[in-house]
């Protein structure tokens, strides 16, 4: 079997590795001179392909964005600068000797499908034949340019966020950004203290979430857990949104700052930024309404306000596309592509896509688990359902996204990290059984349930399991703390540490007494009432008790977390 991988970025590298683990003849084509994809920073905006900004720092922590059998160095910062991410990808590629399978500076011009194979036409004129093909070119290649009324009057510069690299050339300029996604906020923060003014124009507004959560911990180590997922599933949708909106409102009043959207918190892809509130409050950034029209050197908003503008940066996302593919191989309509589990084309299961997904979480572990699944299917160790079943699953997923998210073409490839990882892991056979682990090692089972759902979890069992997975999981709290512990505080060193502290902060006895009484009384009422009252009354009491218990656990999640782990 001969497999072609297109792209040697964060999705291409684990795809190569998955292939060589099963002895597959794999060739990867990379159009740039190095691995890394977006993370391979190329400051020349005319260079081929997309790339990060000079100041880009990831929005997911290192433990949550690691490949499942290759933890990053423990002393690296939790939120890594893009240079660290690129270094990590190089370390991964070197460790598993992946670079020798990559043909650099080689552009795939065209891919055609003939019977049971693919012909890959290269820019240099060569044509290579492959049995299978894995597309790893992502969804940040083709910028989406909006239609703007009256833009012909504007005499300033217009550019897309895709072309932004650094602050050079923006000094002393009036900059307006159209859009309020993560890229828009990163650029606004980057320019805030060197530009004359920075204005963010938003049509809908957004909920702003912080990377650094309670106690200074990375948010994803606290909230991307099986426990949290379970809580969000059992409590009503409205209550779940109220809970998260209350959290973000504590940091910044979204009404006062002009940010509150019409949609609920879970109806959008998270917008993550820790600096925005301070910069708005300090006058470095303005939040404005949607753009209505333009003057020569101004933008005029729909509420009538106008802002000076020398440079307009459109932060309006990207179009999904595969310009090198025949349209009959894989169609893209309305920024949607029909892929089973966002991976396999029902029309041609010899073609698979890795990384064509927008997770609430990191793309790296998701790309890796997709690659593992693909290779097992290619090797006929796993089978796919019928074409009709795959199409039905795709339609179900589309309806779920439309029900949950506000109507936008950017919400066509959304998934929740834990749920999606579990879904694919179940297909592979690498999802751990917590009930089995509970009887063997209750403490470790609790760690898997309450602790961060790190990628190493999916190497405990199943194909290509990793012997170091359990140790890596156990020491995640320590690895999160190590880069922060540059100085030991004298009083803290005298505190007694133990297992209790790992999950609970210093507990007020008054607080414990109060809650203990509530539980005791509630349980007593439920038990003593028995069936002496009506069945309906009894079940109402039971329901009330468990609702109280659930909210108690939710409150625990707010108050007690990993922040005291050594």
Q: PLM ranges: what are they?
A:
Residues 1-58, 71-216, 225-390, 402-566:
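Flavin (primarily FAD) cofactor-binding/catalytic cores of flavoenzymes
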Residues 63-71:
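Short, basic/glycine-rich phosphate-binding loops at helix/coil junctions
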Residues 389-397:
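Post-kinase regulatory C-tail/linker adjacent to protein kinase catalytic domains
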């Amino acid at each position: 079997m001969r497999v072609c991988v297109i792209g040697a970025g964060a999705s291409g590298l684990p795809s190569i590795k998955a292939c060589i683990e099963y002895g597959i003849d794999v060739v990867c084509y990379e159009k740039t001179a190095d691995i890394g994809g977006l993370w391979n920073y190329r400051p020349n905006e005319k260079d081929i392909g997309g790339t990060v900004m000079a100041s880009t720092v990831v929005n997911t922590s290192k433990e949550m964005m690691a490949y499942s059998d290759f933890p990053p160095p423990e002393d690296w910062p939790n939120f890594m600068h893009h240079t660290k991410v690129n270094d990590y990808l190089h370390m991964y590629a070197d460790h598993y000797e992946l670079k020798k399978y990559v043909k650099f500076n080689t552009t795939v011009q065209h891919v055609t499908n003939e019977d049971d194979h693919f012909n890959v036409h290269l820019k240099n004129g060569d044509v290579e034949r492959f049995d299978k093909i894995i597309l790893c070119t992502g969804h940040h290649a083709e910028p989406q340019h909006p239609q703007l009324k009256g833009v012909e009057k504007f005499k300033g510069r217009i550019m897309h966020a895709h072309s932004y690299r650094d602050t050079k050339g923006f000094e002393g300029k009036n900059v307006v950004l159209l859009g309020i996604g993560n890229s828009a906020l990163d650029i606004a923060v980057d320019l805030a203290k060197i530009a004359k003014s920075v204005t963010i124009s938003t049509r809908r507004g957004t909920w702003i979430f912080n990377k650094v959560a309670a106690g200074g911990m990375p948010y994803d180590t606290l909230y991307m857990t099986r426990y949290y997922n379970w809580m969000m599933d059992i409590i009503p949708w409205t209550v779940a949104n109220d809970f998260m909106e209350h959290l973000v409102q504590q940091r910044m009043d979204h009404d006062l700052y002009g940010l509150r959207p019409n949609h609920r918190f879970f109806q959008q892809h998270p917008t993550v930024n820790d600096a925005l509130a301070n910069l708005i409050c300090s006058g470095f950034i303005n939040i404005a309404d949607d753009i209505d029209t333009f003057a020569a050197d101004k933008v005029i908003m729909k509420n009538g306000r106008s802002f000076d503008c020398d440079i307009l940066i459109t932060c309006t996302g990207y179009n999904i596309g595969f310009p090198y593919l025949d349209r009959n191989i894989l169609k893209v309509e309305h920024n949607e592509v029909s892929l089973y589990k966002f991976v396999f084309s029902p029309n041609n299961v010899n073609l698979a896509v890795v990384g064509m997904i927008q997770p609430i979480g990191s793309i790296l572990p998701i790309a890796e688990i997709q690659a593992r699944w693909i290779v097992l299917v290619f090797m006929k160790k796993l089978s796919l359902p019928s074409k009709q079943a795959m199409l039905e699953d795709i339609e179900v997923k589309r309806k779920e996204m439309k029900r949950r998210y506000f109507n936008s073409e950017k919400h066509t490839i959304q998934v929740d990290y834990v749920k999606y990882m579990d879904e694919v892991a179940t297909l592979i056979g690498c999802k751990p059984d917590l009930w089995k682990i509970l009887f063997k090692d209750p403490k470790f089972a609790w760690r898997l349930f309450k602790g961060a759902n790190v990628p190493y979890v999916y190497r405990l069992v199943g194909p290509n399991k990793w012997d170091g997975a359990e140790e890596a999981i156990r020491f995640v709290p320590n690895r999160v703390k190590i880069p922060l512990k540059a100085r030991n505080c004298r009083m803290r060193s005298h505190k007694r540490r133990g297992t209790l502290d790992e999950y609970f902060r210093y507990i007020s006895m008054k607080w414990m007494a109060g809650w203990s009484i509530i539980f005791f009384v509630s349980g007593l009422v439920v038990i003593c009432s028995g069936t002496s009252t009506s069945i309906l009354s009894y079940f109402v009491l039971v329901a009330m008790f468990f609702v109280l218990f659930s909210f108690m656990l939710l409150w625990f999640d707010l108050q007690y977390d990993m922040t005291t782990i050594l």
